[in-house]
Each structure stands twice: as C-alpha cells, then as structure tokens.
C-alpha cells in the first residue's frame, strides 16, 4: 500500500452538527434539485452524485445503480424538455418536514417531504403530487454528493 493511499484511508471527513449540518444539506439538496428539475447541465449533475449512486422509487422501482447511468438518463430527459410544448416539472421541499442526522466520518441522512408542480410548455403551473424521501449524502473534499435516494409514498394532489 502506498503512503498516499494509507493516508487517504486514515482521513475522515469533518461533519458539522446541528443547524450547520442542516444548512449545508439544505443548500446541497436545493442545488441538486434545481439542477435536476430546472436545469439541463449533465456535467453539473455528475458532480452532485457519487459514482455508486443508487436510487429507488416506489412507482418506478430501481431507477439507477450508478451515477453515470443516472446522468445519462437525465441527459436524455434534457433533450425532451427542449420541445416548446414539453412537460416541465418543479420540485419544492416542505421545509417543516426536513430532518438531517450526521453519519460520522461519511456524511448525513436527510429525510423529508416534497411537492411537485408541472406545466406544459409555457402554460400555467399546477401542483400535482406529494412524496416522502430519504437521501444519504457523502461529504468529500469537493463538497456534498448524494449517494443513495429513496423516493416513496407518492400521492396525487387533487
């Protein structure tokens, strides 16, 4: 084992606690979801997810088992959004439901609820759904990246 590898294995990431951790995760997830729903920047998304990202969805099943596959799926959706009459979505965190716990030496577990809005083309936006989520975040030298996503309890909003 090389010295550099041994040193890397011994290093642990410093995870803040309390309100500081919640603020960091809230900012990271806001950035992630803005990229995913409002943006169209696969290179940026690739920096927001881990290479071994896994996502599970109560309606779609296993969405991805790698960051690369997730980014490729996103890139395909980006192309579809370019049509003038394409459906566009927006996700909004319900801040009162947000709960963040530290995972020492690794990152944080985030859980909460969010709502989704849709619009066709430039048409009016409509609230269409609500769901719960759990996300495992990994902190590294380049910041926070999401490593695991559980998206469940999806319900239509009348």
Where are these regions (language model features)?
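A solvent-exposed, acidic/Ser-Thr-rich amphipathic alpha-helical stretch
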Residues: 18, 42-106, 127-128
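Short beta-strand edge/turn micro-motifs at domain boundaries
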Residues: 125-157
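Polar/charged side chains located within well-ordered beta-strands of beta-rich proteins
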Residues: 29, 90-92, 110, 114, ...
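Short, low-complexity N-terminal intrinsically disordered segments enriched in polar/charged residues
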Residues: 2-51, 68, 157-158
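A short, structured loop/turn motif at beta-sheet edges
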Residues: 98-108, 124, 137-143
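Generic short beta-strand segments
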Residues: 51-54, 111-119, 152-153
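Well-ordered beta-strand positions in beta-sheet-rich domains
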Residues: 97, 113, 130-134
